[in-house]
Amino acid sequence: MRQFLFLISVLFANTIFSNITVYFNYGVFSTSSNKPYLETYLTISGNTVKFSPVSGGYQANVNISWKILKGKDIVKDSKYNLMSPIATDTLHLPSFIDNQRFSLDNGQYTLELIVTDNTNPEKKSIHVEKINIALNRDKKVYNSDIQILESFTKSANQSLLTKNGYDLIPYNIN
């Protein structure tokens, strides 16, 4: 009986700790030329991915795979590696963020997101969500979504986090 309970607890623990913790959020915005786009925000919990030794400390490396489908057709897709900041202390592993923008027309979409730890490929997180892009261009005034920020600073260089001359760090953990 003890062996059975031990086996069940090991399998249960393995299931719990096998996924990467990813916080996902998005907003729908309009460009200055009134074209809608989807902006995505990811926060990857540093203590759920493997940090490997690199020059100057330890770093995690994850693969991000996006697919945006309209019906069964792939409208946008992207696959890239995202590196964490370098950590000098493995007791305090930093979370890290990603921000992407996808130009889309009005319509119903399905977003598929897969985040895989490149150091431990069995460890992954999968998210699928329906997204509605509906900006009415016939109206003179309409709303985009709002972006909740953790912080912002005047931008020294243009990056994925830059909007109108400021680096906007999204607050993504609710």
Set out the residue ranges of the language-model regions.
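Intrinsically disordered, low-complexity terminal regions enriched in Ser/Thr/Pro/Gly
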Residues: 17-174
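Sec-dependent N-terminal signal peptides
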Residues: 3-13
